[in-house]
Structure formats: C-alpha cells, structure tokens
C-alpha cells in the first residue's frame, strides 16, 4: 500500500526519525524511499548542503547511506548508491575524503533481490523486477568502491581535476608519476565500463539516473585519460627501456578502452542524450603504434621485421605525411622505394671505393698510392720519371730508390713533422699528382699549378668538365 507514491514503511521510518530529532537520518530516508523513481532533487540538494556545513558529521552521513544499502529492497539499495554518487560528484570534498580513508565500503558483491517480483517493478508499467536489477546494483557498487580507492591512491578525484593542454594536471605530470597514475585511472574506468547496460535495460527512473551519473563520470574520466596518454606519447621517445615498455603497454590498453567507451556512448545516444554532449572519438593512425613498437625494439636491441619497419626513422610519435605515404602496411616496404634505396647505397659504395683504392689500370695513381702506403710490408719499386709527394717520408728530398729500400712504417714513431719539408720547399707545389682519370670515371684530378692549393680537388663529370 502506498500513499502519495511513498510506502507505509517510508512514512513510518521518516516519522520515527522526526520524533527522535534525527534530521539528517530523515533526509537520507526521504532520498532513499521504496518508490521506483530516482531520488528527488530537493532531497539531494539538502544533503549536498549538509556536506558543506561544518556542524554536520560527514562520517554519520556516510554511515547512514551505507546502512540503507543493506536493505533487502533493490530500490532502496540502488537509491542509496545513487545518493552517494551524487554527493561524491557535487558535495564537499570532505565526503569523498572520508569514504577514501574509511574501511566502510559497499559490500554488495553478492546482492540479489529475489522478493520484488511484482508486476512492472513497484507499480511502474514496463519496469524491471528486482532480480534483473541486482547485477547492475553489484556493478554500480563496485564502481563506487573503485572511485574511492582511486581517491585514496591519488589524493584527488579524476573527475574534478583540471583538463586541457594549458592547465591539465595529467598534461603537466612528469613521466615517472604519469606511469603510476594511469593504471589507477584505467582501473576506475574499467569498473565503470563493466556496468555494461543496453538501451532496453534503462527501463525505470532509478537505473536511468545512475546511468546519467555514470555518463557524466565517463566523459570526465576519458578526457583526463586522453590528456595522460598525450603527455605519455610526448615523453615516450625520451624514456629509458623499462619506462618505454610500460608506456607502450598503457597505450595498447588505451586503444582497447577506446572501443569500449565508444560502445557506452552509443547506448547514451540511443537513450536520447544530446549528441553535442557526446564526444567524437577519433582513433590515432596505426602507424603511430608501429613507430612506438619500433622505438622499443631499438632500445631492447631486437630486430624489427621489414613489414613493421618504416624506411625513415622518426624522432616523433607523429611521422610526416611523406614518410607515411612511403610505408605500405599490407605489403611491407614498397618495391620501387626499396630498389631506389639499394641503388643509392650501391652508388655511394662505388664512389667510396674509387676514392680509397684505385684500379690497376689507373697507372701512376695506383703506383703512387702503393708507394706512399706506410702499412705495406714490401712496397713496390718506384717508377722512374714520376715525382711523388711522400707525406709519410722523413724529407721531400729523399730519392724514390731509398724510399723503396726502407719500410715507411719504421719511421712512424719519429716525432718530427713529416709535412714541414714539403711546405718549406721553394717550388710551392712543384710536385704534381697525376691522378687524372678518363672522362666520366668519377676519379679526382689536381692541376698542381703554382699558387693553387694541393687540396683543391675537382670531380670530373660525365661531359669531361670539372664540377664545382
């Protein structure tokens, strides 16, 4: 039997608290009646006001709500959880601090209401019976407990911290603290997503109100989560191996949670929440994850497979469009680009070889290089009529025959300047190096004229002209 929407039990309990002068207990009772609607705004506003009053006992208020959650009726239990959640979100922080520091939590992991099976659920047509609401009560209580544990671990509420690029708490956090903070945030977000209701489950005013509070928390939690991940990626390439491994694992978990958040937001859109209040979740490109994995593999000294290795190294998590366009995620490295890179490497190697070691057909240049090499055990005999500038010899006036008879490596430990005599000579570059090759062979040529530097080299191009 009900009177003006309230049951006889509700009215008797309120009267008892009034006679005992327990105004706070009466307000809690009014907010958690057996009527299958959400707690009334006037009762919630009064309780929020009580949390800001210095003469109101916060522990007493919290214990009254926890006591109401032990009721056998699912509506009373659910409304006590909703009232607690509302005070966490809009009440004074003292209320949250007490729940975080107290061992008094909602012990509803095995809650099951088998008694409320009347038609329509407390007189509401189309409502769900208590047996079907029990799983959502258990999940909701678990989330509120996790919310309290998060505050205990971090000393702040993720749903109330500043967000954004300029003043965001997680955007300005250092890497070490960030790696400890994000797992706590992930645990709270997981507990929220485990509520896992569908549109057809939101069939009465009680569960609808809890869903709106969860939706509010989800938007703020994910915004905070996103700030933390952005900060993590900005610091990723400066981390050591251990931190980089943890950061990559956190980013992979973030990608999984993005899909689950998207499913929750679809339910919110289906039940009529304004699309302007629902954020648009844009996923990062898959190349970002590839770049992070490649960097970690580099730190660990592992080889990265060709299919996952970009052709250009990136010092940032966000590669340029040019680099990403050259990377084919399905077929590995583009064959044309691969051939081009191999050709460039081969050309560079040939040019290097032509400078270091001349072929046997280069004539005087080959003989000159062999004669002046101090590391040869038996230098070849000098060819007559070819003056050689021996940079490793003791003096420029030494004959070629004497240089051939004495090993040049025997003179390496002398402390004299081997270049002094060459630059003191009156000819000023009288000896010329005849290293001129055929046109188009890419070899070097020096004129050796007076007034020109012995290091003024030019490269002969294909047309026979000197390229500057």
UniProtKB/Swiss-Prot annotation:
<dbReference type="InterPro" id="IPR013809">
    <property type="entry name" value="ENTH"/>
</dbReference>
<comment type="subunit">
    <text>Binds clathrin and phosphatidylinositol 4,5-bisphosphate.</text>
</comment>
<dbReference type="InterPro" id="IPR011417">
    <property type="entry name" value="ANTH_dom"/>
</dbReference>
<feature type="region of interest" description="Disordered">
    <location>
        <begin position="438"/>
        <end position="468"/>
    </location>
</feature>
<dbReference type="GO" id="GO:0030276">
    <property type="term" value="F:clathrin binding"/>
</dbReference>
<dbReference type="GO" id="GO:2000370">
    <property type="term" value="P:positive regulation of clathrin-dependent endocytosis"/>
</dbReference>
<dbReference type="GO" id="GO:0030136">
    <property type="term" value="C:clathrin-coated vesicle"/>
</dbReference>
<dbReference type="GO" id="GO:0000149">
    <property type="term" value="F:SNARE binding"/>
</dbReference>
<feature type="domain" description="ENTH">
    <location>
        <begin position="16"/>
        <end position="158"/>
    </location>
</feature>
<dbReference type="InterPro" id="IPR045192">
    <property type="entry name" value="AP180-like"/>
</dbReference>
<keyword id="KW-0333">Golgi apparatus</keyword>
<dbReference type="GO" id="GO:0072583">
    <property type="term" value="P:clathrin-dependent endocytosis"/>
</dbReference>
<dbReference type="GO" id="GO:0006900">
    <property type="term" value="P:vesicle budding from membrane"/>
</dbReference>
<comment type="similarity">
    <text>Belongs to the PICALM/SNAP91 family.</text>
</comment>
<protein>
    <recommendedName>
        <fullName>Phosphatidylinositol-binding clathrin assembly protein LAP</fullName>
    </recommendedName>
</protein>
<dbReference type="GO" id="GO:0005546">
    <property type="term" value="F:phosphatidylinositol-4,5-bisphosphate binding"/>
</dbReference>
<keyword id="KW-0168">Coated pit</keyword>
<dbReference type="InterPro" id="IPR008942">
    <property type="entry name" value="ENTH_VHS"/>
</dbReference>
<comment type="function">
    <text>Assembly protein recruiting clathrin and adaptor protein complex 2 (AP2) to cell membranes at sites of coated-pit formation and clathrin-vesicle assembly. May be required to determine the amount of membrane to be recycled, possibly by regulating the size of the clathrin cage. Involved in AP2-dependent clathrin-mediated endocytosis at the neuromuscular junction.</text>
</comment>
<keyword id="KW-0472">Membrane</keyword>
<dbReference type="GO" id="GO:0006898">
    <property type="term" value="P:receptor-mediated endocytosis"/>
</dbReference>
<dbReference type="GO" id="GO:0098894">
    <property type="term" value="C:extrinsic component of presynaptic endocytic zone membrane"/>
</dbReference>
<dbReference type="GO" id="GO:0048268">
    <property type="term" value="P:clathrin coat assembly"/>
</dbReference>
<dbReference type="GO" id="GO:0005905">
    <property type="term" value="C:clathrin-coated pit"/>
</dbReference>
<dbReference type="GO" id="GO:0005545">
    <property type="term" value="F:1-phosphatidylinositol binding"/>
</dbReference>
<feature type="compositionally biased region" description="Acidic residues">
    <location>
        <begin position="459"/>
        <end position="468"/>
    </location>
</feature>
<dbReference type="GO" id="GO:0007268">
    <property type="term" value="P:chemical synaptic transmission"/>
</dbReference>
<dbReference type="GO" id="GO:0032050">
    <property type="term" value="F:clathrin heavy chain binding"/>
</dbReference>
<dbReference type="GO" id="GO:0042331">
    <property type="term" value="P:phototaxis"/>
</dbReference>
<dbReference type="GO" id="GO:0007270">
    <property type="term" value="P:neuron-neuron synaptic transmission"/>
</dbReference>
<dbReference type="GO" id="GO:0008021">
    <property type="term" value="C:synaptic vesicle"/>
</dbReference>
<dbReference type="InterPro" id="IPR014712">
    <property type="entry name" value="ANTH_dom_sf"/>
</dbReference>
<keyword id="KW-0968">Cytoplasmic vesicle</keyword>
<dbReference type="GO" id="GO:0048489">
    <property type="term" value="P:synaptic vesicle transport"/>
</dbReference>
<keyword id="KW-0254">Endocytosis</keyword>
<dbReference type="GO" id="GO:0150007">
    <property type="term" value="P:clathrin-dependent synaptic vesicle endocytosis"/>
</dbReference>
<dbReference type="GO" id="GO:0005794">
    <property type="term" value="C:Golgi apparatus"/>
</dbReference>
<dbReference type="Pfam" id="PF07651">
    <property type="entry name" value="ANTH"/>
</dbReference>
């Amino acid at each position: 039997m009900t009177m003006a929407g309230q049951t006889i039990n509700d009215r008797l309990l309120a009267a008892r608290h009034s006679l005992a002068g327990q105004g706070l207990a009466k307000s809690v009772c009014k907010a958690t009646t057996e009527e299958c609607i959400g707690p009334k705004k006037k009762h919630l506003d009064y309780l929020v006001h009580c949390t800001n009053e210095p003469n109101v006992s916060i522990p007493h208020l919290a214990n009254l709500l926890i006591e109401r959650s032990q009721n056998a009726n699912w509506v009373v239990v659910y409304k006590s959880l909703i009232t607690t959640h509302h005070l966490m979100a809009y009440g004074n922080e003292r209320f949250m601090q007490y729940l975080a520091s107290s061992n008094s939590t909602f012990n509803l992991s095995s809650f099951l209401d088998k008694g409320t099976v009347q038609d329509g659920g407390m007189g509401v047509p189309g409502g769900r019976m208590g047996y079907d609401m029990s799983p959502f009560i258990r999940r909701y209580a678990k989330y509120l407990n996790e919310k309290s544990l998060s505050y205990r671990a971090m000393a702040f509420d993720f749903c109330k911290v500043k967000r954004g690029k300029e003043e965001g708490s997680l955007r300005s956090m250092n890497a070490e603290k960030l790696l400890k903070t994000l797992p706590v945030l992930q645990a709270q977000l997981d507990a929220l997503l485990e509520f896992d209701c569908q549109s057809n489950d939101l069939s009465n005013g009680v569960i609808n109100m809890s869903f709106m509070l969860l939706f509010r928390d989800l938007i703020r939690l994910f915004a905070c989560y996103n700030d933390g991940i952005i900060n993590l990626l900005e610091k990723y390439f400066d981390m050591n191996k251990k931190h980089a491994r943890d950061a990559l694992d956190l980013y992979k978990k973030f990608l999984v949670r993005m899909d689950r958040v998207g499913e929750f937001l679809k339910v919110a859109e289906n039940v009529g929440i304004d699309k302007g209040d629902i954020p648009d979740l844009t996923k990062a490109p898959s190349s970002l994850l590839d770049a992070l994995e490649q960097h970690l593999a580099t730190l660990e000294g592992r080889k990265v497979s060709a299919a996952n290795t970009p052709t250009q190294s990136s010092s940032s998590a966000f590669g340029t469009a040019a680099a990403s366009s050259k990377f084919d995620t399905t077929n590995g490295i583009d064959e044309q680009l691969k051939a081009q890179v191999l050709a460039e490497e081969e050309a560079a190697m040939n040019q290097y070889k032509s400078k270091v070691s001349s072929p046997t057909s280069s004539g005087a240049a080959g003989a000159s290089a062999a004669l002046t090499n101090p590391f040869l055990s038996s230098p070849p005999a000098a060819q007559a009529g070819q003056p050689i500038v021996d940079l490793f010899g003791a003096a420029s006036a030494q004959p070629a025959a004497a240089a051939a008879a004495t090993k040049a490596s025997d003179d390496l430990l002398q402390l004299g300047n081997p270049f002094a005599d060459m630059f003191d000579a009156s000819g000023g570059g009288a000896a010329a190096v005849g290293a001129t090759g055929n046109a188009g062979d890419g070899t070097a040529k020096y004129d050796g004229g007076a007034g020109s530097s012995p290091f003024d080299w030019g490269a002969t191009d294909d047309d026979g002209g000197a390229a500057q």
